[in-house]
Amino acid sequence: MSATFVAHVRARPETVRLAPEGAPTIAVRVEMPEVWDVVRFAVSPAEPTINLKRRALEELAPDMGEHHEDFVFKLRGWEVLDENAPLAEVGVVDGSILLLTHRRKRPVRRGG
């Protein structure tokens, strides 16, 4: 599969750009299962991971009112431990899919 194909599957129509116009970028997707939503980003491989995480939270969960420390970024099923490292350094490449989810599992509330 190509990075272009992966970037467009079930995502919002717009791409959020985190790099200056004309700068080299990679396309990544950030998925958040709690809100069943996906956002595409055009971002520099040198961008600190924490910046992408914060911007993704603004896009995907602006009303959650929680701090970014309450969430974890996962790449290929593994938690990104050094969020200050550049995206390329933690293994993000063109077409990568990052999962943004609560750090701790939350209990399921049953109605009734």
Q: Across the structure, where does each feature detected by a protein language model lie?
A:
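Ubiquitin system architectures
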Residues: 1-112
